UniProtKB/Swiss-Prot annotation:
This is UPF0309 protein GWCH70_1414. InterPro entries: RpiR-like_SIS (IPR035472), SIS_dom (IPR001347), SIS_dom_sf (IPR046348), SIS_GmhA/DiaA_subfam (IPR050099), UPF0309 (IPR022951). Residues 31-214 form the SIS domain. GO terms for molecular function: carbohydrate derivative binding. GO terms for biological process: carbohydrate derivative metabolic process. Belongs to the UPF0309 family.
Length: 247
């Protein structure tokens, strides 16, 4: 099963690279333009999707102007089952999105593999209403196999400016075995992390080729990195308060 899982993950990644290449390039261009014009990159996901927002935040080798939006009741540590139930509530997103500093010069990623629950959909709609370019990473196969739980009847991919398909299967579990009664082993996290890091890698090069120094974190475990990082954090701390611990 170890080799089988590696094979299946590689198949998903190859599908993304083959079929989503132009969307990945477009996302990278939009990200690079936003940062050069003073914007930031904001991300939101519920449950396990929020892991992707943390993967790229305050990351060695990653972009500095990254702002994840955390609403702890929708994360797992305050009650995993409860978080799943809350994600299904229409208009709940307004409780934490109304006062978020989202601007027209920003890019906003919404991450949801099923794409059917109200909270991610409302988050995407709010980001768009505030003028941010909104990119969704989702599974079209999964989304199209299930009815929307949003009051509009729409799925997440239907409300985005740009959609990137992560090619997760329905239910996200990619493996099966004759001795196991249900499918198992998800792919959305490893593929989603790869998608985001690939987009940001391309965006970094686009900025550099345009004569703009990309704001990149060095690992804090390298001597001299703190001075480098603190100078860039100073530039973005007001827009990304959680970089320095402000709520």
């Amino acid at each position: 099963m170890i080799e089988r899982y590696f094979q299946k993950v590689n198949e998903r990644l190859e599908l993304v690279l083959k079929n989503e290449r132009e969307n990945l390039k477009k996302a990278a261009y939009v990200v690079s333009e936003a940062i050069q014009k003073g914007g930031i990159i904001q991300l939101f996901g519920c449950g396990h999707s929020h892991i992707l927002t943390e993967e790229v935040f305050y990351r060695a080798g990653g972009l500095v102007p990254i702002k994840p939006i955390f609403f702890e009741p929708l994360m797992l540590h305050e009650g995993a089952v409860r978080s799943s139930m809350l994600e299904r509530i229409n208009d709940l997103a307004h409780e934490f999105m109304a006062d978020e500093d989202i601007r027209r010069e920003d890019v906003f990623f919404v991450l949801s593999t099923s794409g059917r629950n109200p909270v991610p959909i409302d988050v995407a709609l709010t980001a768009k209403n505030k003028g941010a370019y909104t990119i969704v990473i989702t599974s079209l196969e999964y989304s199209m196999s299930q009815p929307s739980r949003h009051k509009s009847g729409k799925l997440l991919y239907e409300v985005a400016d740009l959609v990137i398909n992560n090619y997760s299967v329905k239910g996200d579990a990619i493996l099966s075995h004759e001795s196991v009664s249900v499918p198992f082993s998800p792919t959305s996290t490893v593929v989603g992390c790869t998608i985001l890091n690939a987009i940001f890698a391309e965006a970094i090069v686009l900025m550099a080729e345009n004569g703009f120094e990309p704001p990149i974190f060095l690992s804090g475990n390298i001597e001299g990195a703190d001075d480098h990082n603190n100078k860039i954090i100073e530039k973005y701390k007001d827009r990304i308060p959680i970089l320095i611990g402000k709520s």
